[in-house]
C-alpha cells in the first residue's frame, strides 16, 4: 500500500523536495537500515541535480517494498511536514 502511494506521488516528491530534506532522509534511512552506505553514496555522489537525487531515492525506496516505504513516509513527515502534506501523506 505505502509503495503504491509513493509511486503515485513520485512526481510531486521529485519536483518539490529540497537538498536538505534529501540528505536528512538519507541519514534516517541509513540509520534504519533501509538503505546501505553504498545506496546513500549512489544517491549523493552520482547525481548532479536535486531532482535526479530525488528520483533515484524514491525509486530505490519503492523498490525495497512496503515496509521501507512506510519508514520513508514516516521520516518525510518528520523532516518536511509541508511536503508530506502536499503529497497527501498525513
From Swiss-Prot:
Tissue: Primarily expressed in the heart and placenta.
A GO MF term: CARD domain binding
InterPro entries: CARD, DEATH-like_dom_sf, Pept_C14
Protein name: Caspase recruitment domain-containing protein 18
Record keywords, A-Z: Protease inhibitor, Thiol protease inhibitor
GO terms for cellular component: protein-containing complex
CDD domains: CARD_CASP1-like (cd08325)
Species classification: Eukaryota, Metazoa, Chordata, Craniata, Vertebrata
Oligomer and partners: Interacts with pro-CASP1. Interacts with CARD8.
Highest taxon above the source species: Eukaryota
Inducing stimuli: Up-regulated in response to TNF and bacterial lipopolysaccharides (LPS).
Biological process per Gene Ontology, one example term: inflammatory response
Pfam family, one: CARD
Gene name, Swiss-Prot/TrEMBL: CARD18
Domain (CARD): residue spans on this chain: 1-90
Function: Inhibits generation of IL-1-beta by interacting with caspase-1 and preventing its association with RIP2. Down-regulates the release of IL1B.
Amino acid at each position: 500500500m505505502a509503495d503504491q502511494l509513493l509511486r503515485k506521488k513520485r512526481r510531486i516528491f521529485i519536483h518539490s523536495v529540497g537538498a536538505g530534506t534529501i540528505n536528512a532522509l538519507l541519514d534516517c534511512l541509513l540509520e534504519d537500515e533501509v538503505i546501505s552506505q553504498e545506496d546513500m553514496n549512489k544517491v549523493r555522489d552520482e547525481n548532479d541535480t536535486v531532482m535526479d537525487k530525488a528520483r533515484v531515492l524514491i525509486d530505490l525506496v519503492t523498490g525495497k517494498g512496503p515496509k521501507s516505504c512506510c519508514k520513508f513516509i514516516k521520516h518525510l513527515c518528520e523532516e518536511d511536514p509541508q511536503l508530506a502534506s502536499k503529497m497527501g501523506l498525513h
